[in-house]
A protein has these predicted regions:
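N-terminal secretory signal peptides and thylakoid transit peptides that target proteins
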Residues: 2-19
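C-terminal segment of classical bacterial N-terminal signal peptides
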Residues: 21-27
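Flexible "cap/lid" subdomain of the alpha/beta-hydrolase fold that forms the substrate-access gate
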Residues: 31-38, 46-49, 54-57, 61, ...
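Structural cue for short, hydrophobic secondary-structure segments
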Residues: 64-67, 90
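Active-site glycine-rich loops that stabilize anionic/oxyanionic intermediates
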Residues: 67-70, 136
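Serine-hydrolase catalytic-loop signature spanning alpha/beta hydrolases and amidase-signature enzymes
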Residues: 69-77, 88
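A short, Lys/Arg-enriched amphipathic alpha-helix followed by its capping loop at the start of a domain
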Residues: 77-86, 124
Length: 321
């Protein structure tokens, strides 16, 4: 098993990841009891998995699963806003953030493997009940996890994390073409989605006040993408995303049968997963609470305080301590 090393960038990203400040603050009642955020690693199947953790060890668990091209860093402000009440845990997938980057020759990058590792991660941490926050890639990882542990999901929070065909619109036309094209030229066409311009647009498109979005977010994400070999990992994941769509009927059956208390907090201006994908959840979860927020894909960046308040209210009503 090999890991990619990026020396000086490691130091810069580590500094940025632990810096304070951001787009929002914890609610006043939480500030006095804010818990420190710990930055830890655990070995799962010989792979070092990095995770952030905060909150009382005996509190209800909230598992945060990040999207592309980000990492647990996207939750840097949400974690302290919730950790007075909950044990908040946010891991990085292999190839993302501070987790190890195993070589593609020895590790199959895909959503099934990610879900398997997160399942083992929870076992290692002795967690058998958890609320689930899913965003972007976190949705298929989290819902695959839910299929493995159907009785352990205490609540669901979907923030621009899709599970319906209605949410796969114009942005997905070239991606679907890539699914059907196994040629090198088809793969090369997707490299435009790994540029700084593409990463920046994920953060800024659909945001009214762009000055609220920390530019470190897209710069750090891009530095991590630009590590040797990592772009190939992302192209593998773009291809593998089709396996998530194939599982949509199973996800929907889980929703209908288990009826987890659900909050849908969705940046309504998201060009990747538009609000049609948010509304589609109501077909299988008619009791879900839907909040369409005036933001884009990474809604925590500019509307984090609003989302944190929604989560505190929702979990306060739905979870028993």
């Amino acid at each position: 098993m090999t890991q990619v090393s990026f020396s000086r960038r490691d130091a810069f990203v580590a500094l940025s990841a632990t810096a304070t400040g951001g787009a929002f603050a914890a609610p006043a009642q939480a500030k006095a009891a804010t818990q420190p955020t710990h930055h830890r690693t655990v070995s799962i199947d010989g792979i070092e998995i990095f995770y952030r953790e905060a909150g009382p060890v005996d509190a209800p668990v909230l598992l945060l699963l990040h999207g592309f091209p980000s990492s647990s860093r996207m939750f840097r402000n949400l974690i302290p806003a919730l950790s007075d009440r909950y044990r908040v845990i946010a891991p990085d997938y292999p190839g993302f953030g501070h987790s190890a980057v195993p070589d593609r020759a020895s590790f199959k990058y895909g959503f099934a493997r990610f879900a398997e590792l997160i399942d083992k991660f929870l076992t290692e941490l002795r967690i058998d009940r958890f609320a689930l926050y899913v965003m972007d890639y976190g949705a298929p990882v989290g819902f695959r996890l839910a299929l493995k542990r159907p009785g352990q999901v205490t609540a669901l929070i979907a923030q621009n994390g899709n599970a319906y065909e209605e949410g796969l619109r114009d942005f997905w036309i070239p991606v679907k073409a890539y699914w059907a094209d196994d040629t090198p030229s088809g793969r090369d066409k997707m490299r435009g989605g790994l540029t700084l311009e593409a990463t920046r647009s994920q953060y800024l498109d659909g945001v009214a006040d762009k000055s609220l979005v920390d530019p470190d977010s897209w710069l750090i994400d891009q530095m991590l993408i630009d590590r040797p070999g990592v772009s190939e990992i992302h192209l593998d994941l773009f291809k593998d995303y089709r396996t998530n769509v194939e599982l949509y009927p199973q996800f929907h059956a889980f929703f209908r049968e288990r009826k987890p208390p659900t909050l849908i907090a969705w940046g309504k201006n998201d060009f990747i997963f538009p609000p049609e994908g948010a509304r589609a959840y109501l077909r299988d979860l008619p009791e879900a609470e839907l909040s369409l927020i005036d933001s884009g894909h990474f809604a925590l960046e500019d509307k984090g305080e609003e989302i944190a308040a929604l989560i505190r209210d929702f979990l306060g009503r739905k979870l028993k301590r």
